Design a protein with these regions (language model features):
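PLD/PLD-like phosphodiesterase catalytic module centered on the HKD motif
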Residues: 2-113, 131-226, 230, 234-272, ...
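Generic alpha-helical secondary structure signal
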Residues: 20, 31, 277, 301, ...
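Active-site cores of enzymes that catalyze phosphoryl transfer or operate on phosphate-rich substrates
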Residues: 57-96, 101, 292-400
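Short acidic, glycine-rich surface-loop motifs adjacent to enzyme active sites
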Residues: 116-117, 121-124, 421
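Structured alpha-helical segments in the cores of large, soluble enzyme domains
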Residues: 104-108, 112, 390-407
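Eukaryotic endomembrane system proteins
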Residues: 191-194, 208-357, 367
Length: 622
Protein backbone atom coordinates (compact mmCIF):
# COMPACT_ATOMS: atom_id res chain seq x y z
CA UNK A 1 0.00 0.00 0.00
CA UNK A 2 2.79 2.44 0.91
CA UNK A 3 4.58 1.79 -2.36
CA UNK A 4 1.46 2.41 -4.39
CA UNK A 5 0.64 5.52 -2.41
CA UNK A 6 4.16 6.96 -2.74
CA UNK A 7 4.38 6.31 -6.46
CA UNK A 8 0.98 7.82 -7.15
CA UNK A 9 1.71 10.72 -4.82
CA UNK A 10 4.89 11.42 -6.77
CA UNK A 11 2.85 11.54 -9.97
CA UNK A 12 0.00 13.73 -8.78
CA UNK A 13 1.61 15.98 -6.19
CA UNK A 14 3.48 18.23 -8.59
CA UNK A 15 1.69 18.89 -11.88
CA UNK A 16 0.74 22.34 -10.65
CA UNK A 17 3.20 24.62 -12.43
CA UNK A 18 0.51 25.67 -14.87
CA UNK A 19 -1.79 26.50 -11.95
CA UNK A 20 0.59 29.23 -10.85
CA UNK A 21 0.62 31.05 -14.16
CA UNK A 22 -0.85 34.54 -13.98
CA UNK A 23 -4.48 34.37 -15.13
CA UNK A 24 -6.00 36.80 -17.58
CA UNK A 25 -7.84 39.71 -15.94
CA UNK A 26 -11.20 38.50 -14.74
CA UNK A 27 -14.41 40.43 -15.24
CA UNK A 28 -14.48 41.82 -11.66
CA UNK A 29 -10.89 43.06 -12.19
CA UNK A 30 -11.89 44.89 -15.37
CA UNK A 31 -15.05 46.22 -13.73
CA UNK A 32 -13.02 47.35 -10.73
CA UNK A 33 -10.76 49.35 -13.00
CA UNK A 34 -13.72 50.94 -14.75
CA UNK A 35 -15.27 51.84 -11.37
CA UNK A 36 -12.09 53.48 -10.16
CA UNK A 37 -11.00 50.68 -7.84
CA UNK A 38 -7.39 49.63 -7.60
CA UNK A 39 -7.05 46.03 -8.82
CA UNK A 40 -5.44 43.76 -6.28
CA UNK A 41 -1.74 43.12 -6.76
CA UNK A 42 -0.70 39.52 -7.30
CA UNK A 43 -0.01 37.60 -4.13
CA UNK A 44 3.25 35.71 -4.00
CA UNK A 45 2.42 32.10 -3.20
CA UNK A 46 4.80 31.06 -0.47
CA UNK A 47 3.97 27.39 -0.25
CA UNK A 48 4.61 25.45 2.89
CA UNK A 49 7.10 23.09 1.29
CA UNK A 50 9.44 23.13 -1.66
CA UNK A 51 7.27 20.54 -3.36
CA UNK A 52 4.51 23.10 -3.84
CA UNK A 53 6.57 25.90 -5.44
CA UNK A 54 6.91 26.53 -9.18
CA UNK A 55 10.68 25.99 -8.89
CA UNK A 56 10.50 22.43 -7.57
CA UNK A 57 12.33 19.67 -9.41
CA UNK A 58 10.13 17.63 -11.74
CA UNK A 59 8.17 14.82 -10.15
CA UNK A 60 8.87 11.21 -10.92
CA UNK A 61 6.87 9.90 -13.84
CA UNK A 62 6.88 6.32 -12.54
CA UNK A 63 3.25 5.68 -11.69
CA UNK A 64 1.46 2.42 -10.99
CA UNK A 65 -0.74 1.14 -13.77
CA UNK A 66 -3.67 0.90 -11.41
CA UNK A 67 -4.74 1.95 -7.94
CA UNK A 68 -5.67 -1.05 -5.76
CA UNK A 69 -9.42 -1.12 -5.26
CA UNK A 70 -9.08 -2.33 -1.67
CA UNK A 71 -7.21 0.71 -0.30
CA UNK A 72 -10.02 3.14 0.54
CA UNK A 73 -7.85 5.74 2.26
CA UNK A 74 -5.40 6.13 -0.59
CA UNK A 75 -7.10 9.24 -2.04
CA UNK A 76 -7.31 11.30 1.19
CA UNK A 77 -3.76 10.28 2.10
CA UNK A 78 -2.45 11.44 -1.28
CA UNK A 79 -4.40 14.71 -1.10
CA UNK A 80 -3.19 15.43 2.42
CA UNK A 81 0.45 14.68 1.64
CA UNK A 82 0.51 16.36 -1.77
CA UNK A 83 -1.17 19.58 -0.63
CA UNK A 84 0.06 19.56 2.97
CA UNK A 85 -3.45 19.93 4.35
CA UNK A 86 -4.66 18.23 7.54
CA UNK A 87 -6.37 14.84 7.53
CA UNK A 88 -8.48 13.75 10.49
CA UNK A 89 -9.48 10.24 11.50
CA UNK A 90 -13.12 9.71 12.45
CA UNK A 91 -15.70 7.06 13.19
CA UNK A 92 -18.64 6.67 10.83
CA UNK A 93 -20.88 6.20 13.87
CA UNK A 94 -20.31 9.86 14.71
CA UNK A 95 -21.52 11.05 11.30
CA UNK A 96 -25.23 11.62 10.82
CA UNK A 97 -26.97 12.74 7.67
CA UNK A 98 -29.70 15.30 8.31
CA UNK A 99 -32.26 14.47 5.60
CA UNK A 100 -34.41 17.58 5.18
CA UNK A 101 -34.55 21.38 5.65
CA UNK A 102 -37.00 21.14 8.56
CA UNK A 103 -34.81 18.62 10.38
CA UNK A 104 -31.83 20.87 9.70
CA UNK A 105 -33.60 23.69 11.54
CA UNK A 106 -34.66 21.47 14.42
CA UNK A 107 -31.08 20.17 14.70
CA UNK A 108 -29.78 23.74 14.88
CA UNK A 109 -32.28 24.66 17.60
CA UNK A 110 -31.48 21.55 19.61
CA UNK A 111 -27.74 22.15 19.49
CA UNK A 112 -28.03 25.86 20.32
CA UNK A 113 -30.01 25.11 23.45
CA UNK A 114 -27.75 22.28 24.63
CA UNK A 115 -24.34 23.87 23.86
CA UNK A 116 -22.35 24.36 27.06
CA UNK A 117 -19.09 26.01 26.05
CA UNK A 118 -19.09 27.34 22.51
CA UNK A 119 -21.11 28.02 19.40
CA UNK A 120 -19.23 28.98 16.24
CA UNK A 121 -20.99 29.85 13.01
CA UNK A 122 -19.81 30.77 9.53
CA UNK A 123 -22.57 31.57 7.06
CA UNK A 124 -23.31 33.90 4.18
CA UNK A 125 -26.19 35.50 6.07
CA UNK A 126 -28.99 34.93 8.56
CA UNK A 127 -32.45 35.67 7.22
CA UNK A 128 -33.76 38.98 8.55
CA UNK A 129 -36.99 37.21 9.53
CA UNK A 130 -35.23 34.61 11.70
CA UNK A 131 -36.08 36.26 15.02
CA UNK A 132 -36.81 32.86 16.59
CA UNK A 133 -33.29 31.67 15.83
CA UNK A 134 -31.85 34.90 17.24
CA UNK A 135 -34.01 34.47 20.35
CA UNK A 136 -32.66 30.95 20.88
CA UNK A 137 -29.12 32.34 20.76
CA UNK A 138 -30.02 35.16 23.14
CA UNK A 139 -31.59 32.84 25.72
CA UNK A 140 -28.76 30.32 25.47
CA UNK A 141 -26.23 33.07 26.23
CA UNK A 142 -28.33 34.45 29.10
CA UNK A 143 -28.72 31.04 30.74
CA UNK A 144 -25.09 29.95 30.39
CA UNK A 145 -22.61 32.76 31.16
CA UNK A 146 -19.71 30.48 30.23
CA UNK A 147 -21.05 30.00 26.67
CA UNK A 148 -19.00 31.72 23.94
CA UNK A 149 -20.53 32.64 20.56
CA UNK A 150 -18.59 33.48 17.39
CA UNK A 151 -20.49 34.37 14.20
CA UNK A 152 -18.84 35.18 10.86
CA UNK A 153 -21.02 36.45 8.00
CA UNK A 154 -20.47 38.29 4.74
CA UNK A 155 -20.43 42.07 5.12
CA UNK A 156 -22.20 42.89 1.85
CA UNK A 157 -24.93 40.26 2.12
CA UNK A 158 -25.57 40.75 5.84
CA UNK A 159 -26.15 44.49 5.39
CA UNK A 160 -27.88 44.45 1.99
CA UNK A 161 -31.31 45.60 3.20
CA UNK A 162 -30.03 48.27 5.60
CA UNK A 163 -30.81 50.97 6.50
CA UNK A 164 -34.20 50.88 4.77
CA UNK A 165 -35.28 47.68 6.54
CA UNK A 166 -34.08 44.91 8.84
CA UNK A 167 -31.06 42.83 7.85
CA UNK A 168 -28.86 40.06 9.21
CA UNK A 169 -26.74 42.73 10.87
CA UNK A 170 -29.64 44.48 12.60
CA UNK A 171 -31.10 41.12 13.66
CA UNK A 172 -27.97 40.08 15.57
CA UNK A 173 -26.03 43.24 16.46
CA UNK A 174 -27.55 43.45 19.96
CA UNK A 175 -25.90 40.17 20.99
CA UNK A 176 -22.39 41.64 21.21
CA UNK A 177 -23.56 44.56 23.37
CA UNK A 178 -25.88 42.47 25.50
CA UNK A 179 -23.16 39.87 26.20
CA UNK A 180 -19.85 41.70 25.66
CA UNK A 181 -17.76 38.99 27.33
CA UNK A 182 -19.39 36.14 25.40
CA UNK A 183 -20.04 37.23 21.81
CA UNK A 184 -17.94 38.07 18.75
CA UNK A 185 -19.87 39.12 15.63
CA UNK A 186 -17.76 39.57 12.51
CA UNK A 187 -18.52 40.60 8.92
CA UNK A 188 -15.97 39.64 6.26
CA UNK A 189 -15.55 41.92 3.24
CA UNK A 190 -13.58 41.03 0.13
CA UNK A 191 -10.27 42.89 -0.19
CA UNK A 192 -11.45 44.07 -3.62
CA UNK A 193 -14.37 46.14 -2.37
CA UNK A 194 -14.86 47.65 1.07
CA UNK A 195 -18.26 48.38 2.66
CA UNK A 196 -19.54 51.94 2.22
CA UNK A 197 -16.71 52.86 -0.15
CA UNK A 198 -17.46 55.17 -3.05
CA UNK A 199 -17.01 52.30 -5.48
CA UNK A 200 -19.41 50.05 -3.57
CA UNK A 201 -22.06 52.77 -3.64
CA UNK A 202 -21.63 53.27 -7.37
CA UNK A 203 -21.85 49.57 -8.16
CA UNK A 204 -24.87 48.99 -5.91
CA UNK A 205 -25.57 46.57 -3.09
CA UNK A 206 -26.94 43.72 -5.19
CA UNK A 207 -23.95 43.68 -7.55
CA UNK A 208 -21.30 44.27 -4.88
CA UNK A 209 -21.64 40.61 -3.99
CA UNK A 210 -20.16 39.66 -7.35
CA UNK A 211 -16.73 40.73 -6.14
CA UNK A 212 -16.53 37.93 -3.58
CA UNK A 213 -18.38 36.63 -0.54
CA UNK A 214 -17.79 34.85 2.75
CA UNK A 215 -19.57 31.71 1.57
CA UNK A 216 -18.56 29.04 4.14
CA UNK A 217 -21.40 27.21 5.91
CA UNK A 218 -20.09 25.80 9.19
CA UNK A 219 -22.26 25.43 12.30
CA UNK A 220 -20.41 24.26 15.40
CA UNK A 221 -21.66 23.50 18.91
CA UNK A 222 -19.10 22.41 21.52
CA UNK A 223 -17.40 19.50 19.68
CA UNK A 224 -20.23 18.86 17.19
CA UNK A 225 -20.15 20.34 13.68
CA UNK A 226 -22.72 20.60 10.90
CA UNK A 227 -21.15 21.02 7.45
CA UNK A 228 -23.56 22.08 4.72
CA UNK A 229 -24.20 24.44 1.85
CA UNK A 230 -27.29 25.96 3.47
CA UNK A 231 -27.68 29.45 4.86
CA UNK A 232 -29.83 30.34 7.87
CA UNK A 233 -33.08 31.64 6.41
CA UNK A 234 -36.67 30.54 6.03
CA UNK A 235 -36.36 28.97 2.56
CA UNK A 236 -33.39 26.89 3.72
CA UNK A 237 -35.48 25.64 6.65
CA UNK A 238 -38.56 24.72 4.61
CA UNK A 239 -38.36 24.28 0.81
CA UNK A 240 -34.78 24.72 -0.41
CA UNK A 241 -33.05 21.34 -0.73
CA UNK A 242 -29.45 21.06 0.40
CA UNK A 243 -27.06 18.61 2.07
CA UNK A 244 -26.34 18.55 5.81
CA UNK A 245 -23.88 16.35 7.65
CA UNK A 246 -23.61 16.34 11.44
CA UNK A 247 -20.25 15.18 12.78
CA UNK A 248 -20.55 14.49 16.51
CA UNK A 249 -17.92 14.63 19.24
CA UNK A 250 -14.96 15.39 17.02
CA UNK A 251 -12.93 17.90 19.00
CA UNK A 252 -9.92 18.16 16.63
CA UNK A 253 -12.13 18.95 13.62
CA UNK A 254 -14.26 21.34 15.68
CA UNK A 255 -11.13 23.14 16.88
CA UNK A 256 -9.78 23.36 13.33
CA UNK A 257 -12.99 24.91 11.99
CA UNK A 258 -13.41 27.23 14.98
CA UNK A 259 -9.79 28.37 14.62
CA UNK A 260 -10.37 28.98 10.90
CA UNK A 261 -13.38 31.20 11.67
CA UNK A 262 -11.38 33.10 14.28
CA UNK A 263 -8.51 33.60 11.84
CA UNK A 264 -10.79 35.09 9.19
CA UNK A 265 -12.44 37.19 11.89
CA UNK A 266 -9.11 39.00 12.32
CA UNK A 267 -9.57 40.35 8.80
CA UNK A 268 -13.24 41.24 9.27
CA UNK A 269 -15.31 44.06 10.69
CA UNK A 270 -16.76 43.86 14.19
CA UNK A 271 -20.55 44.22 14.14
CA UNK A 272 -21.71 46.54 16.93
CA UNK A 273 -25.11 47.61 18.23
CA UNK A 274 -25.86 51.31 17.66
CA UNK A 275 -29.44 51.48 18.88
CA UNK A 276 -31.21 52.59 22.05
CA UNK A 277 -29.21 51.50 25.16
CA UNK A 278 -32.31 51.56 27.36
CA UNK A 279 -34.14 49.20 24.99
CA UNK A 280 -31.16 46.85 25.05
CA UNK A 281 -31.09 46.88 28.86
CA UNK A 282 -34.85 46.35 29.10
CA UNK A 283 -34.85 43.34 26.77
CA UNK A 284 -31.86 41.77 28.52
CA UNK A 285 -33.57 42.07 31.90
CA UNK A 286 -36.83 40.51 30.67
CA UNK A 287 -35.56 38.07 28.05
CA UNK A 288 -37.03 35.00 29.78
CA UNK A 289 -40.49 36.59 29.69
CA UNK A 290 -40.33 37.33 25.96
CA UNK A 291 -40.64 35.37 22.76
CA UNK A 292 -39.58 36.29 19.24
CA UNK A 293 -42.84 38.19 18.59
CA UNK A 294 -42.64 40.45 21.66
CA UNK A 295 -42.81 44.06 20.50
CA UNK A 296 -39.70 45.22 22.36
CA UNK A 297 -37.67 42.31 21.03
CA UNK A 298 -38.89 42.93 17.47
CA UNK A 299 -37.87 46.57 17.81
CA UNK A 300 -34.45 45.51 19.10
CA UNK A 301 -33.82 43.30 16.06
CA UNK A 302 -34.46 46.28 13.79
CA UNK A 303 -32.08 48.62 15.60
CA UNK A 304 -29.22 50.53 14.05
CA UNK A 305 -25.75 49.01 13.93
CA UNK A 306 -22.27 49.99 12.87
CA UNK A 307 -19.14 48.29 11.59
CA UNK A 308 -15.83 48.77 13.37
CA UNK A 309 -12.37 47.66 12.25
CA UNK A 310 -10.09 46.51 15.07
CA UNK A 311 -7.77 44.22 13.13
CA UNK A 312 -8.78 41.33 15.36
CA UNK A 313 -7.40 42.92 18.53
CA UNK A 314 -10.75 42.79 20.33
CA UNK A 315 -11.56 39.14 19.61
CA UNK A 316 -12.46 37.23 22.76
CA UNK A 317 -11.05 33.87 21.66
CA UNK A 318 -7.98 32.61 19.82
CA UNK A 319 -6.25 29.40 18.79
CA UNK A 320 -3.77 28.30 21.44
CA UNK A 321 -0.42 26.63 20.72
CA UNK A 322 -1.92 23.15 21.10
CA UNK A 323 -4.81 23.81 18.72
CA UNK A 324 -7.45 24.30 21.39
CA UNK A 325 -9.57 27.44 21.56
CA UNK A 326 -8.96 29.63 24.60
CA UNK A 327 -9.43 33.17 25.89
CA UNK A 328 -7.47 35.47 23.59
CA UNK A 329 -5.49 37.01 26.45
CA UNK A 330 -4.08 33.60 27.36
CA UNK A 331 -2.91 32.78 23.82
CA UNK A 332 0.12 34.01 21.88
CA UNK A 333 -0.61 37.53 20.66
CA UNK A 334 -1.13 38.28 16.98
CA UNK A 335 -0.43 41.56 15.27
CA UNK A 336 -3.53 43.60 14.48
CA UNK A 337 -3.92 44.23 10.76
CA UNK A 338 -4.87 47.47 9.06
CA UNK A 339 -8.22 47.94 7.33
CA UNK A 340 -6.47 48.20 3.97
CA UNK A 341 -3.63 46.25 2.37
CA UNK A 342 -4.11 43.18 4.56
CA UNK A 343 -4.33 40.69 1.72
CA UNK A 344 -0.75 39.40 1.86
CA UNK A 345 -0.94 39.14 5.65
CA UNK A 346 -4.13 37.09 5.41
CA UNK A 347 -2.59 34.82 2.79
CA UNK A 348 0.45 34.16 4.95
CA UNK A 349 -1.71 33.60 8.03
CA UNK A 350 -3.82 31.02 6.18
CA UNK A 351 -0.76 29.24 4.83
CA UNK A 352 0.76 29.10 8.31
CA UNK A 353 -2.58 27.92 9.71
CA UNK A 354 -2.80 25.10 7.16
CA UNK A 355 0.77 23.90 7.74
CA UNK A 356 0.33 24.09 11.51
CA UNK A 357 -2.80 21.95 11.38
CA UNK A 358 -1.29 19.56 8.82
CA UNK A 359 1.58 18.80 11.17
CA UNK A 360 -0.66 18.71 14.23
CA UNK A 361 -3.20 16.34 12.66
CA UNK A 362 -0.44 14.08 11.35
CA UNK A 363 1.16 13.82 14.79
CA UNK A 364 -2.10 13.29 16.68
CA UNK A 365 -4.08 11.16 14.22
CA UNK A 366 -4.99 7.80 15.74
CA UNK A 367 -4.47 4.66 13.72
CA UNK A 368 -8.07 3.60 14.37
CA UNK A 369 -11.16 4.99 12.71
CA UNK A 370 -13.01 3.84 9.63
CA UNK A 371 -13.27 7.30 8.06
CA UNK A 372 -10.89 10.06 6.96
CA UNK A 373 -11.76 13.77 6.67
CA UNK A 374 -9.67 16.28 4.71
CA UNK A 375 -10.83 19.93 4.94
CA UNK A 376 -10.22 21.86 1.71
CA UNK A 377 -10.23 25.66 1.68
CA UNK A 378 -10.71 27.88 -1.35
CA UNK A 379 -10.03 31.62 -1.12
CA UNK A 380 -8.98 32.54 -4.63
CA UNK A 381 -8.49 36.22 -3.85
CA UNK A 382 -6.00 35.20 -1.15
CA UNK A 383 -4.22 32.59 -3.30
CA UNK A 384 -5.52 29.70 -1.16
CA UNK A 385 -6.60 27.04 -3.66
CA UNK A 386 -6.76 23.72 -1.84
CA UNK A 387 -10.04 22.57 -3.39
CA UNK A 388 -9.02 23.29 -6.97
CA UNK A 389 -5.51 21.91 -6.37
CA UNK A 390 -7.23 18.66 -5.41
CA UNK A 391 -8.89 18.28 -8.83
CA UNK A 392 -5.75 17.27 -10.80
CA UNK A 393 -5.03 14.74 -8.06
CA UNK A 394 -8.55 13.35 -8.33
CA UNK A 395 -8.23 13.19 -12.11
CA UNK A 396 -5.04 11.14 -11.85
CA UNK A 397 -6.58 8.96 -9.15
CA UNK A 398 -9.68 8.15 -11.21
CA UNK A 399 -7.63 7.45 -14.31
CA UNK A 400 -5.55 4.94 -12.31
CA UNK A 401 -8.48 3.37 -10.45
CA UNK A 402 -8.79 0.12 -12.35
CA UNK A 403 -11.06 -2.89 -11.81
CA UNK A 404 -8.86 -5.17 -13.90
CA UNK A 405 -7.33 -6.77 -10.81
CA UNK A 406 -10.81 -7.89 -9.79
CA UNK A 407 -11.08 -10.30 -12.70
CA UNK A 408 -13.79 -10.82 -15.32
CA UNK A 409 -16.48 -11.76 -12.79
CA UNK A 410 -16.43 -8.47 -10.85
CA UNK A 411 -19.93 -7.41 -9.82
CA UNK A 412 -19.21 -3.74 -10.54
CA UNK A 413 -16.25 -3.42 -12.93
CA UNK A 414 -16.47 0.36 -13.28
CA UNK A 415 -16.48 3.63 -11.32
CA UNK A 416 -19.33 6.12 -11.02
CA UNK A 417 -18.85 9.77 -10.09
CA UNK A 418 -22.03 11.62 -9.15
CA UNK A 419 -21.66 15.40 -9.24
CA UNK A 420 -24.27 18.05 -8.50
CA UNK A 421 -24.54 21.79 -8.05
CA UNK A 422 -27.60 23.96 -7.67
CA UNK A 423 -25.83 26.55 -9.81
CA UNK A 424 -24.44 24.59 -12.75
CA UNK A 425 -21.49 26.60 -13.99
CA UNK A 426 -18.53 24.25 -13.64
CA UNK A 427 -15.14 25.93 -13.53
CA UNK A 428 -12.49 24.98 -16.04
CA UNK A 429 -10.87 22.55 -13.61
CA UNK A 430 -14.10 20.68 -12.88
CA UNK A 431 -14.87 20.53 -16.60
CA UNK A 432 -11.41 19.12 -17.19
CA UNK A 433 -12.18 16.43 -14.61
CA UNK A 434 -15.48 15.40 -16.21
CA UNK A 435 -14.14 15.54 -19.78
CA UNK A 436 -10.65 14.21 -19.05
CA UNK A 437 -9.09 12.16 -21.83
CA UNK A 438 -6.90 10.47 -19.23
CA UNK A 439 -10.03 9.13 -17.54
CA UNK A 440 -12.19 8.27 -20.54
CA UNK A 441 -9.55 6.70 -22.78
CA UNK A 442 -9.32 3.53 -20.66
CA UNK A 443 -11.92 1.19 -22.12
CA UNK A 444 -10.88 -1.49 -19.62
CA UNK A 445 -11.56 0.77 -16.62
CA UNK A 446 -14.56 2.95 -17.43
CA UNK A 447 -15.55 5.92 -15.28
CA UNK A 448 -19.10 7.24 -15.61
CA UNK A 449 -19.97 10.82 -14.61
CA UNK A 450 -23.60 11.47 -13.68
CA UNK A 451 -24.33 15.17 -13.30
CA UNK A 452 -27.42 16.76 -11.75
CA UNK A 453 -28.29 20.45 -12.11
CA UNK A 454 -31.30 22.49 -11.03
CA UNK A 455 -34.10 22.84 -13.55
CA UNK A 456 -35.05 26.46 -14.35
CA UNK A 457 -38.09 26.14 -12.06
CA UNK A 458 -35.92 24.82 -9.21
CA UNK A 459 -33.47 27.70 -9.50
CA UNK A 460 -33.78 30.09 -6.56
CA UNK A 461 -34.03 33.07 -8.93
CA UNK A 462 -36.94 31.65 -10.95
CA UNK A 463 -39.67 34.28 -11.22
CA UNK A 464 -37.48 37.10 -9.89
CA UNK A 465 -37.89 40.60 -11.24
CA UNK A 466 -35.32 42.55 -13.19
CA UNK A 467 -31.91 41.20 -14.11
CA UNK A 468 -32.16 38.38 -11.56
CA UNK A 469 -35.07 36.92 -13.51
CA UNK A 470 -32.69 36.09 -16.34
CA UNK A 471 -30.45 33.92 -14.18
CA UNK A 472 -32.29 30.57 -14.71
CA UNK A 473 -32.04 31.04 -18.47
CA UNK A 474 -28.37 31.94 -18.07
CA UNK A 475 -27.73 28.61 -16.38
CA UNK A 476 -29.63 26.84 -19.15
CA UNK A 477 -27.24 28.44 -21.63
CA UNK A 478 -24.22 27.35 -19.59
CA UNK A 479 -25.60 23.81 -19.42
CA UNK A 480 -26.05 23.82 -23.19
CA UNK A 481 -22.51 25.04 -23.84
CA UNK A 482 -21.16 22.33 -21.55
CA UNK A 483 -23.31 19.66 -23.18
CA UNK A 484 -22.05 20.69 -26.61
CA UNK A 485 -18.52 19.88 -25.42
CA UNK A 486 -19.71 16.50 -24.12
CA UNK A 487 -21.21 15.71 -27.52
CA UNK A 488 -18.13 16.97 -29.38
CA UNK A 489 -16.01 14.52 -27.37
CA UNK A 490 -18.54 11.72 -28.00
CA UNK A 491 -19.06 11.15 -24.29
CA UNK A 492 -22.87 11.30 -24.40
CA UNK A 493 -23.53 7.81 -25.75
CA UNK A 494 -22.95 4.47 -23.98
CA UNK A 495 -19.91 2.51 -25.10
CA UNK A 496 -20.15 -0.25 -22.49
CA UNK A 497 -23.00 -2.62 -21.55
CA UNK A 498 -22.83 -1.78 -17.83
CA UNK A 499 -26.09 -0.91 -16.08
CA UNK A 500 -26.33 0.45 -12.53
CA UNK A 501 -29.00 -1.80 -11.04
CA UNK A 502 -29.37 0.47 -7.99
CA UNK A 503 -30.11 3.63 -10.00
CA UNK A 504 -33.81 4.61 -9.71
CA UNK A 505 -33.52 6.55 -12.99
CA UNK A 506 -31.66 3.89 -14.98
CA UNK A 507 -32.40 3.97 -18.70
CA UNK A 508 -30.04 1.21 -19.73
CA UNK A 509 -26.28 1.20 -20.23
CA UNK A 510 -24.33 4.02 -18.61
CA UNK A 511 -22.92 6.83 -20.74
CA UNK A 512 -19.49 8.33 -19.98
CA UNK A 513 -21.23 11.61 -19.13
CA UNK A 514 -24.91 12.04 -18.28
CA UNK A 515 -26.67 15.30 -17.38
CA UNK A 516 -30.03 15.49 -15.60
CA UNK A 517 -32.11 18.29 -14.07
CA UNK A 518 -33.64 18.21 -10.61
CA UNK A 519 -37.23 19.34 -10.23
CA UNK A 520 -39.74 19.04 -7.39
CA UNK A 521 -42.96 20.99 -7.21
CA UNK A 522 -42.76 23.89 -4.78
CA UNK A 523 -39.06 23.35 -4.05
CA UNK A 524 -35.80 24.99 -5.06
CA UNK A 525 -32.48 23.16 -5.36
CA UNK A 526 -29.26 24.13 -3.61
CA UNK A 527 -27.40 20.82 -3.22
CA UNK A 528 -23.78 20.52 -4.15
CA UNK A 529 -21.61 17.48 -3.83
CA UNK A 530 -19.49 14.75 -5.34
CA UNK A 531 -19.76 11.02 -4.64
CA UNK A 532 -17.36 8.32 -5.90
CA UNK A 533 -18.25 4.63 -6.07
CA UNK A 534 -15.25 2.57 -7.14
CA UNK A 535 -15.08 -0.90 -8.67
CA UNK A 536 -16.19 -3.84 -6.54
CA UNK A 537 -15.75 -7.59 -6.71
CA UNK A 538 -18.99 -8.53 -4.91
CA UNK A 539 -21.07 -5.35 -4.52
CA UNK A 540 -23.08 -4.53 -7.68
CA UNK A 541 -25.03 -1.60 -6.21
CA UNK A 542 -24.12 2.02 -5.64
CA UNK A 543 -21.90 2.35 -2.56
CA UNK A 544 -19.96 5.65 -2.48
CA UNK A 545 -16.82 5.51 -0.37
CA UNK A 546 -15.84 9.14 -1.01
CA UNK A 547 -17.81 12.37 -0.97
CA UNK A 548 -17.11 16.09 -1.12
CA UNK A 549 -19.48 18.25 0.93
CA UNK A 550 -19.49 21.93 1.82
CA UNK A 551 -20.18 25.38 0.48
CA UNK A 552 -18.49 25.32 -2.93
CA UNK A 553 -20.66 25.40 -6.06
CA UNK A 554 -17.69 24.22 -8.19
CA UNK A 555 -17.93 27.26 -10.46
CA UNK A 556 -15.67 30.18 -11.35
CA UNK A 557 -16.98 32.27 -8.45
CA UNK A 558 -16.17 29.56 -5.94
CA UNK A 559 -12.75 29.08 -7.51
CA UNK A 560 -11.66 32.70 -7.82
CA UNK A 561 -13.70 35.01 -5.59
CA UNK A 562 -15.59 33.47 -2.67
CA UNK A 563 -14.46 32.05 0.67
CA UNK A 564 -15.25 28.32 0.62
CA UNK A 565 -14.76 25.32 2.89
CA UNK A 566 -15.47 21.72 1.90
CA UNK A 567 -14.73 18.36 3.47
CA UNK A 568 -13.35 15.47 1.44
CA UNK A 569 -14.60 12.40 3.29
CA UNK A 570 -13.62 8.79 2.59
CA UNK A 571 -15.03 5.87 4.55
CA UNK A 572 -14.78 2.10 4.62
CA UNK A 573 -17.90 1.83 6.80
CA UNK A 574 -20.70 -0.03 4.98
CA UNK A 575 -23.27 1.89 7.03
CA UNK A 576 -21.95 5.31 6.00
CA UNK A 577 -21.58 4.16 2.41
CA UNK A 578 -25.24 3.11 2.47
CA UNK A 579 -26.14 6.56 3.82
CA UNK A 580 -24.25 8.24 0.98
CA UNK A 581 -25.88 5.91 -1.54
CA UNK A 582 -29.33 6.84 -0.23
CA UNK A 583 -28.42 10.50 -0.57
CA UNK A 584 -27.52 10.00 -4.24
CA UNK A 585 -30.59 7.90 -4.96
CA UNK A 586 -32.95 10.44 -3.40
CA UNK A 587 -31.32 13.18 -5.44
CA UNK A 588 -31.67 11.21 -8.66
CA UNK A 589 -35.29 10.27 -7.97
CA UNK A 590 -36.15 13.96 -8.44
CA UNK A 591 -33.82 14.32 -11.45
CA UNK A 592 -36.16 12.80 -14.00
CA UNK A 593 -35.29 15.02 -16.95
CA UNK A 594 -32.34 13.64 -18.87
CA UNK A 595 -30.80 16.39 -20.95
CA UNK A 596 -29.76 15.93 -24.57
CA UNK A 597 -29.23 18.04 -27.66
CA UNK A 598 -32.89 17.86 -28.66
CA UNK A 599 -34.00 19.16 -25.25
CA UNK A 600 -31.66 22.14 -25.45
CA UNK A 601 -32.99 22.93 -28.95
CA UNK A 602 -36.62 22.87 -27.83
CA UNK A 603 -38.69 26.04 -27.78
CA UNK A 604 -38.92 25.99 -23.97
CA UNK A 605 -35.12 26.12 -23.68
CA UNK A 606 -34.43 28.97 -26.06
CA UNK A 607 -32.38 31.75 -24.49
CA UNK A 608 -32.97 35.27 -25.79
CA UNK A 609 -30.12 37.30 -27.26
CA UNK A 610 -29.90 39.78 -24.37
CA UNK A 611 -29.54 36.99 -21.81
CA UNK A 612 -26.91 35.29 -23.97
CA UNK A 613 -24.81 38.47 -24.11
CA UNK A 614 -25.18 39.12 -20.38
CA UNK A 615 -24.32 35.50 -19.55
CA UNK A 616 -21.11 35.57 -21.53
CA UNK A 617 -20.18 38.94 -20.01
CA UNK A 618 -21.01 38.04 -16.40
CA UNK A 619 -20.11 34.35 -16.52
CA UNK A 620 -17.31 34.61 -13.90
CA UNK A 621 -19.84 36.01 -11.41
CA UNK A 622 -22.43 33.24 -11.77
Amino acid sequence: MLAARNMLCARVALPYVACFASPRPTYPTVLARNAGLRPLPPVRRTMATASRTPHSPPASQHVPESVPHDQPFLLPEIVSEALHVPMFSASAHSMVRVPSPRQFYSTLRHHIMKAQHRIFIATLYVGKEERELAMFLTKALARRPQLQLTILMDAMRATRESPQSASSASLLSHLASMFPDQVDLRLYATPVLRPNSIASRIIGKRFNEGFGLQHMKVYGFDDDVIITGANLSRDYFTRRMDRYLLIREHKPLANYLHALILLLSRFSYALLYDGDPSLLSHVKGHIEDMDDSSSDYVQLTRSAFRLHWDGGSDLLLAEDTDGTIATAGLCPSTRACLETNWRSSATQALQDFTMRWYERAKAQRPASGDTRIVPLLQLGQLAITQETDMIPILTQYLSALSPRALGPTAARPYTTVDLTSGYFTLSGLYKSLVLSDAIHRHSQAPVFFRLVAASPEANGFFGSRGLSGRIPAAYTLLEKLFWNRVVDKRLHAPVHPYVDVSDPMSEGPLAPVELREWSKYGWTYHEKGLWITGPSLAQPVLSPATTLIGSSNYGARSEKFDVECSLLITTQSPQLQDTLAKEVQEMRESARTRMDTATFRSKERRVDAVTQVLTRLLRPLL
